[in-house]
Amino acid sequence: MIFDKVNYKEFDKEVWEAIQAEEKRQQNNIELIASENVVSKAVMAAQGSILTNKYAEGYPGRRYYGGTECVDVVESLAIERAKEIFGAKFANVQPHSGSQANCAAYMALIEPGDTVMGMDLAAGGHLTHGASVSFSGQTYNFVAYNVDEETGLLDYDAILKQAKEVQPKLIVAGASAYARTIDFAKFREIADAVGAKLMVDMAHIAGLVAAGLHPNPVPHAHITTTTTHKTLRGPRGGLILTNDEELIKKINSAIFPGIQGGPLEHVIAAKAVSFKEVLDPAFKDYAQKVIENSKAMAEVFLANPNFKVITGGTDNHLFLVDVTKVVENGKVAQHLLDEVNITLNKNSIPYEKLSPFKTSGIRIGSAAITARGFGVEEARKVAQLTIKALENAENEKALEEVRQEVRALTDQFPLYEGL
């Protein structure tokens, strides 16, 4: 067979070397990007399997191509496991991403031009919750709700008042940078009060929901969407859940043939494997440690007057920090920390005064370091090293000390043994 005997390390040296460099980067860097995680070898193996060869438009038992009996088994397993994890009656595991899951949910719930309320991007929302640069803001009439300017917390009374004024057809709950527990039951009350549907995007907290450590939105939302990576620790992809039989029909049609063609069955296999991992009791222990590590890091920042932790702490895997007392902006902080092998992202904070390309804040997440085995002691050390770097931006000696301590930590907790 053509190319079947080719050693790709030699055939495509450029790609091989880039992959090796990325493996080295991940091994030697402390990963604090809240949307990233470290998948298991089993998940990687499933995603790299022979299923990548198979085209399978449609759904299990209802395909447009033949030879789908094996991928039907895999996709059915993924569906059943997702339903079991979140207590949902129906699931679609085909979305290629969380954004596509959200797109399909909108298509199932509303019409172009309808009014929708979504969380303000700077307050912690997501691009697909109505940002003008996103399909969501360009297709629907999104009106943003915000957080309290003093506390940074969701103000449900203010959201209800705004909903009564706006009269949306849909309310979107969920966030990409909100550190506190979200009351989905309260959001449903607000939606019901104005005759709106409720959609929840739980992409960031899905792993915590799965472990029973954050309220489950599925009983309250008409549709719940999520990614399958982040705190779920699976492959990159999307998932849609609902308890409504009529809505799952609309969701399925919106995904295929609406916005996607053939599903990525190798990725769905990886989703199935990761869902089985989530169902294992060990996953709850992992998720609990994710929260403990996040709180431990936040406490270190809270104790330092040079930094402001938005909302005054965290209930989940992430928190935001205003860094403008020590560096010019979040972009500068991100680049500075890159130099000492600590990876995170600049992030807008509520009522942001700087552009989204600079920002006043950084976002810090604990999911990836926890997957590597970091505990509370190491998490505190990571926060201390982050602060040391930010407070010594012009001190090369101090920055080199941080690099060395980062390397000591990453050597102590290998990314993958024998990869």
Curated annotation (Swiss-Prot):
Subcellular location(s) of the protein: Cytoplasm
Binding site residues for (6S)-5,6,7,8-tetrahydrofolate: 121, 125-127, 246, 355-357
Gene Ontology cellular-component annotations: cytosol
Cofactor(s) this protein cannot do without: pyridoxal 5'-phosphate
SUPFAM superfamilies (alphabetical): PLP-dependent transferases
Matches recorded under PROSITE patterns: SHMT
UniProt keyword Transferase, yes or no: yes
GO terms assigned for molecular function: glycine hydroxymethyltransferase activity; pyridoxal phosphate binding
GO process annotations (BP): glycine biosynthetic process from serine; tetrahydrofolate interconversion
Classification via Gene3D superfamilies: Aspartate Aminotransferase, domain 1, Type I PLP-dependent aspartate aminotransferase-like (Major domain)
Pfam family, one: SHMT
Reaction(s) catalysed (UniProt annotation): (6R)-5,10-methylene-5,6,7,8-tetrahydrofolate + glycine + H2O = (6S)-5,6,7,8-tetrahydrofolate + L-serine
Sites of N6-(pyridoxal phosphate)lysine modification: 230
Site (Plays an important role in substrate specificity): 229
Enzyme class of the recorded protein, top EC level: transferase
Enzyme Commission identifier(s): 2.1.2.1
Keywords carried by this UniProt record: Amino-acid biosynthesis, Cytoplasm, One-carbon metabolism, Pyridoxal phosphate, Transferase
Pathway field: One-carbon metabolism; tetrahydrofolate interconversion; Amino-acid biosynthesis; glycine biosynthesis; glycine from L-serine: step 1/1
Keyword Repeat belongs to the record: no
Function: Catalyzes the reversible interconversion of serine and glycine with tetrahydrofolate (THF) serving as the one-carbon carrier. This reaction serves as the major source of one-carbon groups required for the biosynthesis of purines, thymidylate, methionine, and other important biomolecules. Also exhibits THF-independent aldolase activity toward beta-hydroxyamino acids, producing glycine and aldehydes, via a retro-aldol mechanism.
Binding partners and assembly: Homodimer.
Database matches in HAMAP family: SHMT
Family affiliation: Belongs to the SHMT family.
Protein name (database record): Serine hydroxymethyltransferase
